Each structure stands twice: as structure tokens, then as C-alpha cells.
Amino acid sequence: MAGELFYPDVLKARLKDLMEWKNLIIKGVYGAEPYTWDEIENWLNTSCEAIKPFICDTGALLRDAEENGKKILFEAQLGSLRDLDHGIYPMTTSSNTIAAYAPVGSGLSSAELDRIVGVVKAYSTCVGEGPFTCEMFGEEAEKLREAGGEYGAKTGRPRRVGPVDLVATRYGVEVQGATEIHLMGQLMARSIICT
């Protein structure tokens, strides 16, 4: 869709087709205010020109960097349990979150990953529904949620929280092929779940 920024009429037609359906989800599922076409069009008019200079063939850009001996860093979000192939279906995202897919998605499918850093928060979070074996409730959960700022960026909905789950973490390390682990923060130093 990024290339459609160069064809505003095509982009606007596509967005108009999607807008009604997406607004139903925004309002019905997330309880947020739906967007108006004026809001979308204003955003397009101000943002498209700022974004256009950064649109390129990322595969060619990365191949050039690799050929020139530059280091390439891929970053991802979401955990292994949200991966389309290795996660807990149907609570997965629509794509692959596993490190091995990063080069493929970038256009540099021949890349050799020589270092995979698994980043683990000192507590667990979950967005949306699905199994969450170590979920905390009540006052303790509220304190953790507040300390970590665990609220949806768009909706402000509170995220589900709990102590770090080492079983899920071990699974993530295995399917990611992590070569090292970094544990972030100290909010839940006393609570570790080994289910």
C-alpha cells in the first residue's frame, strides 16, 4: 500500500472501501470513536508528502548494505505465541513474528542471522483475548499495569498483565532460535511462573 501514496486517487478509493468496515471494528470492538472521511483525507494530505521520500525497494537497499559490509538490524514486536504458524491459534496475528521470517519480509531473503536477541519483559502482558496462564487480577494487577503503562496506544484499554512465564519464554527461545536473552526491567523480580 505504500506505493499507492504516489497514486492518491487509487489510495483514496481503497480507503473509502475499507473505512466503513474498519469503523465498525473501531467502534464495536474497541469502543473508540470512528474516523470521518475528512479526518482521513486531512491526514493523507499532510502525511503522504512527508512519507514519500522514504519509500524505496527495501530489498535492493538491504542487499546494497550487505554487499558493503554494513550491519543490518531487524526488530520485531509481538511474541512467539502470536506467530501465525507457531502461536496459539486462533489468537495469532496475521503474519509471522519469528526471527527467521524477518529477512524474508524485508526483501533480503538470503540474509544469514548470526545473532538473535530475545527480549523478555520482567512481567507478561497480553493484548486481547486468548489463554494467559499467569494472568493477575485485582489490586496487584492494577499496580503492575500502572507502573508499566500497560494500556492500548489507540484505545487506552488496560492490557492483561502477570508475572513472567518461563515456560512460554523457553518456547519462544526455542522457536526463535535466540542466541541470547535480555531481561528488561525489575517490576516483578519476586514473581516468576514455572508452569
Residue spans for each PLM region:
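Non-transmembrane, aqueous-exposed alpha-helical and coiled segments at domain scale
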Residues: 1-195
